[in-house]
Amino acid sequence: MSRLVVVSNRIAPPDNKGGAGGLAVGVLGALKAAGGLWFGWSGETGNEDEPLKKVTKGNITWASFNLSEQDYEDYYCQFSNAVLWPAFHYRLDLVQFQRPAWEGYMRVNALLADKLLPLIKENDIIWVHDYHLLPFASELRKRGVNNRIGFFLHIPFPTPEIFNALPPHDELLEQLCDFDLLGFQTENDRLAFLDSLSSQTRVTTRSGKHHIAWGKDFQTEVYPIGIEPDEIALQAAGPLPPKLVQLKAELKNVKNIFSVERLDYSKGLPERFLAYEALLENYPQHRGKIRYTQIAPTSRGEVQAYQDIRHQLETEAGRINGRYGQLGWTPLYYLNQHFDRKLLMKIFRYSDVGLVTPLRDGMNLVAKEFVAAQDPANPGVLVLSQFAGAANELTSALIVNPYDRDDVAAALNRALTMPLAERISRHAEMLDVIVKNDINRWQERFIHDLKEVTPRSAERRQQNNVATFPKLA
């Protein structure tokens, strides 16, 4: 039986007592089934030459390493999060490309390949995650690794007009072709990648999803990531802590609109605040009878763009409350702090509307978690951005354009006044999708497809490396 090796920028420590996110749950499920290794950065800066820190529990080994301050800055802060993250979320205006950061990104991917190489066994299958590690398969191939290597991109893949604006776009595309299997959240992301590839070289495609580019064979497929709906339902329905009992009492006479995500410009939070203001302006009958709570803990607080959006939200929240607030009623609660994930599931359950309106998002698991947390007999309504990957699956949500504040306001009004029968019907349809495509189904499909790939031989790889095709005119 093949062993599974998972590679990600960060690893979830084995003693993590907090609620695990989507990646951790899916990865651990796959590792428990096959046994294997989870390899990634420890989250600490220090001496890169120190031996890997290894912890084994059951049939899983966690192997982590430190990064130097310089590599952390170049690889993680600069290229991954100041170039790739904004570009892949369609924000070229925020891209800060610097050649030393690109060199640092490549240097760290090579370093990680060197560290992982002694741990790889002949029949291992390797599953690499996300934008921090786009060149990783290429680095392993250079070191003679012929194992099956798969890659899953958790964030969107931008259209060629966006992606090809990145100075090293051609190198990144060719490096991605060294993976055997490339997984995307949506069909739009998969096609955007192939369109970018076709703009740089000739791509031969057979059976729809088997491709050859730069003489390299690879496959592409769509794997929308899921959640653990049963676990979330249990968390949501459990006993309420005292603070939430008090909150529930406060919300007894108002309808609650609730949103939670980390503070990030891709989430559309300023646009969301303005849409809520449009609701209060266009539908004054709701004034004094609703409350919008936005939880947005700080993320990457050292980055200027994130500091700017935090200040913008604080200003807008104060302005909206000052304009529409009344004695005894505050229309908008903005909380820039972290809340326990299990507590959030309980808050979801007692919310009348879940407002999830990112400007661009690979999937957005919050939308799925909101649905899973609801009481099926009296569910809340999900208002969801058309630019979230989840909108492709949760078609019974109220789908909106987050750039159109009046559209979002109208959807909020509809959600607040929706009859119970319609709420139950829409919720049941979405829950059925979530249950059928849960986190275990996601990882099982990917691992199954990766195992079906024919391993690369050294001879085949050498032949592929010299085979080239002219770019399309």
From Swiss-Prot:
InterPro entries reported for this sequence: Glyco_trans_20, Trehalose_OtsA
Alphabetical GO biological process terms: trehalose biosynthetic process
Keywords, sorted A to Z: Glycosyltransferase, Transferase
Site (Involved in alpha anomer selectivity): W85, I155
Positions contributing to D-glucose 6-phosphate binding: R10, Y76, D130, R300
GO MF annotations, alphabetized: alpha,alpha-trehalose-phosphate synthase (UDP-forming) activity
Recorded metabolic or biological pathway in which this protein acts: Glycan biosynthesis; trehalose biosynthesis
Binding site for UDP-alpha-D-glucose: G21, G22, R262, K267, F339, L365, V366, A367, K368, E369
Superkingdom field: Bacteria
Coiled-coil residue spans: none
Gene3D superfamilies from the UniProt entry: Glycogen Phosphorylase B
Sequence similarity: Belongs to the glycosyltransferase 20 family.
General function of this protein: Probably involved in the osmoprotection via the biosynthesis of trehalose. Catalyzes the transfer of glucose from UDP-alpha-D-glucose (UDP-Glc) to D-glucose 6-phosphate (Glc-6-P) to form trehalose-6-phosphate. Acts with retention of the anomeric configuration of the UDP-sugar donor.
Name recorded for this polypeptide: Trehalose-6-phosphate synthase
Gene designation per UniProt: otsA
